[in-house]
Amino acid sequence: MRDAIIADPLLAIDHETVAEKKKQSKNLKISLLLLLILLATSGYYSFSDNITTVFLSRQAIDDDHSLSLGTISDVVESENGVVAADDARCSEIGASVLRSGGHAVDAAVAITLCVGVVNPMSSGIGGGSFLIVSSQKDSKAEAFDMRETAPLAASKDMYKNDASAKSLGALSMGVPGEIAGLYEAWKRYGRLPWKPLFEPAIKLARDGFVVYPYLGKAISTKVAMILKDPGMRSVFSRNGQVLKTGETCYNPELAQSLETISEQGPGAFYNGTVGEKLVKDVKKAGGIITMDDLRSYKVRVTDAMSVDVMGYTVHGMPPPSGGTVGFSMVMNILDSYSNLYTASGRELGLHRLIEAMKHMFAARMDLGDPEFVNVTNSMNQMLSKAHAEEIQKRIFDNTTFPPEYYMNRWSQLRDQGTSHFCVVDADRNSVSMTSTVNYRFGAGVLSPSTGIVLNNEMDDFSTPTEITPDMLPPAPTNFIEPNKRPLSSMTPLVITKDGEFVAALGGAGGMHIIPAVLQVFLNCFVLNMKPKEAVESARIYHRLIPNVVSYENFTTINGDHIGVSEDTKMFLAERGHELKELSGGAIVQLIVQSFKEEKEEEMIIEIGRKIGKKSKPLKGLLTAVSDPRKDGKPAAV
């Protein structure tokens, strides 16, 4: 992995870059003119200032006002580009960016901003993200770490007198990185101008958007918190009552903040009026973030961590994400079996997966921010195939064990929340991105002057004095230090085979993310399920402590029932697993590329090898699936 490139917080728009992208946009218009004129007549585009301006498509507008989520497919297919996000409006916005000739990163900017508006309980520009970009042009994958950092005034003992302040209130806020990271990715890969990518999100925030069921449910679980905070109350309640599903939510202050950033660039956030307003509100609410914190924020750009597992190459985030390392460790353990699943059924493979995950969760708390702690030895061991084989010998098919058997030393990180989406464009450039404000509605504070929900990412750090349910000591590698980034479960992945795009996937749901992404991957690429079945199949989860297998058994927002079979539960119980029903689970988005003739695909790849040159990327059928566990829907070009 090459050394990280530390990107400046970008105090103003790079006008040379903007001019170049305007030129590119103009060239794209010439080739797409007839198509765009046709689309404009049906409400998909309008033209402004001689550039293509992306607006909410007619489909997205209709979806927003009808709430007819059940009429939109959970699966779409296209050879020209697809999006899978956890909100139908945001998927359609991303697809409309692709239709106008945008790169997958252009679409990612618009989608991220949209999700931050319509799903503010999960993400927003007051939070942070991990983003993987896979570029077919040069066959490389890059990782953009825009994770929140601890403020300059932070210390490992800052919560010793009030443990609750670590998760609730402005003191729990880390320095946001999302805007800086989006700009850095756009500057490197984007084809379209910066400002138009903001317009759909601005329109939703200013003109109002319908509260979809998942947001409505989140609001209903946080009534007291919402009504207590002036900023939250102004956006998520009306006449003393919190908003309900089907009602319209407005956030004009957020619209203004987004508009300012779209015009002035990230500098408006990190060294300008938006940041100044935010810092003032944070200070008033009891936080410690200053303008120096915003000005000192840096995006980390590195080669993606690439690991070969089960015949595929997985591209993901390096630490402080524990996702790629944890995913790869479990896959290596499972790959050491000659037959992971038996002919009689999947249950034994599921037991082996649970045991492998328990070993992984025991090991991952040795990870942390590599800029502050040396994680090389821990990573090497977790990624070692020889170590995986040794662990596999400690897994018995007829029983499970108490937590101490797995040699865990530290208290587990219990991160929460997040939102994930995937994008693949016509050229097979792909983005897999997970964003978060951590808990539902983050710190429970909304900046009244900017409309920004504050994250509570400081809760993802460990502290010396905290007492956790597992009664284990906190992990020193994850202690708070100024500018440090906390450990995370976020697992955005891009999968390739012989250099060609195969899949993009990732999940939302804190500690449940890694188990969910593992199961979708296994369903799709080992059990050979169709993409829709791979995502929708019931899942199990384990955190090591408590020593309990959580199994899904619930009805989705769309009325579909998801549940683990009685035979599976009996099989696991017979091996000593304690079982607990879970009314929900992680939300996974998936895009898979398939080909009509596998032999033809293999022949093309083999020819490319023989001539020593990479041919044009293979363009098969792209299938995008949005998880029915949330009210998202995919969209196609």
Curated annotation (Swiss-Prot):
Keywords: Acyltransferase, Detoxification, Glycoprotein, Hydrolase, Membrane, Transferase, Transmembrane, Transmembrane helix, Vacuole
Function: May play a role in protecting plants from some xenobiotic chemicals by degrading vacuolar glutathione conjugates into cysteine conjugates.
Organism: Arabidopsis thaliana
Reported phenotype of the disruption mutant: No visible phenotype under normal growth conditions.
Gene responsible for this protein: GGT3
SUPFAM superfamilies noted in UniProt: N-terminal nucleophile aminohydrolases (Ntn hydrolases)
Molecular function terms, GO-annotated: glutathione gamma-glutamylcysteinyltransferase activity; glutathione hydrolase activity; leukotriene C4 gamma-glutamyl transferase activity
Entry's Gene Ontology cellular component terms: vacuolar membrane; vacuole
Annotated localization: Vacuole membrane
Expression induction: By auxin.
Family membership: Belongs to the gamma-glutamyltransferase family.
Record membrane topology: Single-pass membrane protein
Pathway the protein acts in: Sulfur metabolism; glutathione metabolism
The protein's name: Glutathione hydrolase 3
Matches recorded under Gene3D superfamilies: 1.10.246.130, 3.60.20.40
Tissue specificity note: Expressed in roots, cotyledons, leaves, flowers and siliques.
Binding site for L-glutamate: R147, T436, N438, E457, D460, S488, S489, G509, G510
UniProt xrefs under Pfam families: G_glu_transpept
KW ATP-binding (keyword) present: no
Residues modified by glycosylation: N50, N271, N374, N398, N553
UniProt cross-references to NCBIfam families, sorted A to Z: g_glut_trans
Catalytic activity: an N-terminal (5-L-glutamyl)-[peptide] + an alpha-amino acid = 5-L-glutamyl amino acid + an N-terminal L-alpha-aminoacyl-[peptide]; glutathione + H2O = L-cysteinylglycine + L-glutamate; an S-substituted glutathione + H2O = an S-substituted L-cysteinylglycine + L-glutamate
UniProt lineage: Eukaryota, Viridiplantae, Streptophyta, Embryophyta, Tracheophyta
